[in-house]
A protein has these predicted regions:
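Conserved N-terminal phosphate-binding loop of PLP-dependent enzymes in the Aspartate aminotransferase
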Residues: 1-287
């Protein structure tokens, strides 16, 4: 109740809203966490059988090795006028894990990473229209899919996702398709001058009938930039992107959540000829 008086909705993240789980009974705030345990403000201890930090803490809360390294880095200094050498080291490691990629950019959140990737891909393809399959954040470009039909994102985000404030001029720039429905995607490409295909590699169901391979070939044949959003799927079943397991490479891939094990970091990796379009548009952020 106190939070709702000062924070719209009561929480910063929709998925952490206690009303989604058990209204008036679900503990909304924590005092500390360790491994798979969370302590609330009253000192009660819970075993987290839910999201483990919305899927971020794949190694458990406050992993001792990771926290030791984080604390050491913090003690060496905070943000300065100069750049951090860790950016280069992590970028090189991500490229090493994904040999098809050559360049990397970092962001703080998945929503921001998706917006950066879309900007780069639109610049590279020279086309505005995007076909999407999955959950890709909260920014205007994505939510515009619901303009004119409030049910377009039902299978990807939530039923009748509210989009007030999203410019109506973005209508008919983003089109959704269902996972494993290749014919639906093909029709979008044929009818709407699609320049970018953005999708999750896999979520609740596995790809069937070489779905990912067909998407890759379609993108290559039509000069479309293919983006795999692996904010959710990356660094779980494989050490890197889940696309490695399926042996299908995108032009751009996005990683988050498990990448930082509870610390805010996201990465956009991609082919050099695509990623260099960063230099043709303004993409910059202090943090």
């Amino acid at each position: 109740k106190r939070a709702k008086q000062i924070i719209p909705g009561g929480t910063m993240l929709f998925s952490k809203n206690p009303d989604l789980f058990l209204p008036d009974r679900w503990p909304a705030y924590f005092s500390k966490s360790k491994r798979c345990k969370i302590w609330d403000l009253d000192g009660d201890c819970y075993t987290d059988l839910s999201y483990m930090g919305v899927g971020t803490n794949v190694l458990g809360y406050s992993h001792p090795y990771i926290e030791k390294k984080v604390i050491k880095t913090i003690k060496s200094g905070s943000m300065t006028t100069l750049n951090s050498v860790e950016e280069i080291r992590l970028a090189e490691k991500l490229v090493e894990l994904h040999p098809w990629s050559e360049m990397v950019r970092f962001t703080r959140s998945g929503g921001e990473a998706n917006s950066v990737a879309i900007r780069i891909a639109r610049a590279a393809s020279g086309r505005d229209n995007v076909a999407i399959c999955g959950y890709h954040g909260w920014h205007d470009w994505y939510l515009s899919c619901n303009i004119g039909n409030k049910n377009n994102l039902n299978q990807h985000l939530m039923n009748e996702a509210p989009i007030q404030g999203v410019p109506t001029s973005l209508k008919n720039t983003v089109f959704q398709f269902e996972y494993n429905n290749f014919l639906q995607l093909k029709k979008l490409v044929e009818n709407y001058n699609i320049g970018v295909i953005k999708m999750e590699v896999q979520r609740n169901v596995e790809p069937k009938n070489n779905f990912l391979g067909k998407v890759r070939k379609l993108a290559s044949d039509r000069g479309i930039v293919l983006i795999f959003d692996e904010c959710t799927s990356g660094f779980r079943q494989t050490f890197g992107g889940l696309h490695r397991y399926h042996k299908v490479n995108p032009d751009i891939a996005i990683f988050g959540k498990a990448l930082g094990n509870g610390h805010a970091i996201n990465a956009i990796i991609g082919r050099k000829d695509v990623m260099e379009f960063c230099n043709s548009t303004f993409i910059s952020s202090t943090f």
